[in-house]
Amino acid sequence: MAEESLRTQVNKPSSAFIAVSWVALITGAAAYIIGLFNASMLLNEKGYYLILILYGLFAAVSLQKIVRDKLEGIQVTAIYFGLCWASIVICIALLAIGLWNASLELSEKGFYIMAFLLSLFGAVAVQKNIRDLDYLRTHTQPPSVPNYSNTQFQPIEHDEEKN
């Protein structure tokens, strides 16, 4: 029953939305990484921020997957669902704490926050598009057309006595 209700809700994502999702992911991640590479901070600080974006992207994709699994009626454990949400919150909190204590200009801090959030949004949107397209590919079949090419037709015999 959950599958039927989901089937009516899943629409094929438009090409524009697919493209914008990929652009958001690539732009956000590239801006964050380039900004990190060009930043004048210690190597261990750069490593901290690099791990945060990697952890954040994984947590965001995992959360999107688990929410979609629940919609499709796939059993999801409460502990994993909670861990996914906790990972997102922890990741954003660690970024906020790290930037609060960093000796960066306010504009740089804002840049990192925006690039980070754009990356997370892009990752979730790309994952959603992939999942939607896969669902539509596997759950919608084109109407079956009978193949009569090798069939030999037999004349139908009518019993006129039955009339």
Feature map (PLM): residue ranges:
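Cytosolic juxtamembrane amphipathic/interface segments immediately preceding
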Residues: 3-14, 73
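Membrane-helix boundary connector in multi-pass membrane proteins
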Residues: 95-110
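Short, highly charged, low-complexity non-transmembrane loops/tails of multi-pass membrane proteins
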Residues: 135-154
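Transmembrane alpha-helix entry/boundary detector in multi-pass membrane proteins
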Residues: 14-17, 37-58, 80, 109-111
